[in-house]
Amino acid sequence: MALLTPEDLENINRQLHEADSTVRRVTGLDIKGVCKDFYGTTPCCEKVGIVPVTSGNGIIGNFSESLRAITEYFGFDSFVTTMPDVSGYYEAVRNGAQIILMADDNTFLAHNLKNGKIANNQPCTGIIYAEIASRYMKADSKDVLAVGLGKVGFPGAAHLVNKGFRVYGYDADKALLEKTVSDLGITPFEPENPRRFSIIFEATPCADTVPESVISDNCVISTPGIPCAISRELQEKYGVELIMEPLGIGTASMLYSIL
Ligand SMILES: NC(=O)C1=CN([C@@H]2O[C@H](COP(=O)(O)OP(=O)(O)OC[C@H]3O[C@@H](n4cnc5c(N)ncnc54)[C@H](O)[C@@H]3O)[C@@H](O)[C@H]2O)C=CC1
Ligand SMILES: N[C@@H](CCCCNC(=O)[C@H]1CCC=N1)C(=O)O
């Protein structure tokens, strides 16, 4: 699993603000507005306990601190426990947390202790980035290119199919692409005869996975994938609306989904 680095999370508040203004330009709503409209829920200062976890590759510098800044940005009352792991979980509950946020190297979860609802970051991230892309006000058709059909990309592509979009899918893993084509009934995209899209959704751990041949002027590229799916040069050349942020939008999706 591709893990975040402390560098990915630098200036998380600036990254969130920048992503929010792009989301507003693309959909007419800010991230809060999209989450509220999509999930039908609104935060009202729920107490969120953020528990650092030392397993596997261990604690990621400023991961917990970023989650605190993100939860505050979206209207929650949050704290990071002083202890990690089991002791931290105990500390969070004893200090009145209604929602637990914690992540090991494979699963990043949000658990609402009051209503029992639980969310996983990977599907929640794919679905919210796909939802934002699907709300692009200037889209010229219902055709979408989805690049990367893994733990984040597949749920996002499935969400776009469910919303009635014509999804053209691509993944470097041919077997996975074939399975996704049959599971979701999407069209396999062939890089050898490309066409241009006004909506592109990318979720891969590789850079430059969206070729120039598929980019149309002012298209939306909604991409949780890290590193970025296109170069700064291509983004400027085509006036691409790039929705890309390392942690906050996916975390908001998790939290709104369990309220
Ligand atoms: N921004 C955010 O909030 C979040 C970002 N992520 C990031 O999203 C990315 C995807 O995560 P997962 O879905 O969990 O990974 P995954 O490994 O389950 O799926 C990635 C997929 O991309 C495909 N792929 C790799 N290189 C490719 C290429 N050049 N062209 C086409 N397909 C290619 C792989 O075959 C794989 O199927 C990672 O970079 C991860 O760090 C994950 C969660 C949240
Ligand atoms: N155990 C560590 C956190 C590990 C998080 C690993 N997961 C990722 O990097 C995923 C989450 C969103 C994007 N990638 C800590 O508590 O500091």
UniProtKB/Swiss-Prot annotation:
Pathway: Amino-acid biosynthesis; L-pyrrolysine biosynthesis. The keyword NAD applies. GO terms for molecular function: oxidoreductase activity. L-pyrrolysine binds at residues 4, 53, 60, 103. It is an enzyme of class 1 (oxidoreductase). Transmembrane segments: none annotated. Keywords: Amino-acid biosynthesis, NAD, Oxidoreductase. It catalyses: (3R)-3-methyl-D-ornithyl-N(6)-L-lysine + NAD(+) = L-pyrrolysine + NH4(+) + NADH + 2 H(+). Belongs to the PylD family. Catalyzes the ultimate step of the pyrrolysine biosynthesis pathway by converting the isopeptide (3R)-3-methyl-D-ornithyl-N(6)-L-lysine to the 22nd proteinogenic amino acid. This is Pyrrolysine synthase. It comes from Methanosarcina acetivorans (strain ATCC 35395 / DSM 2834 / JCM 12185 / C2A).
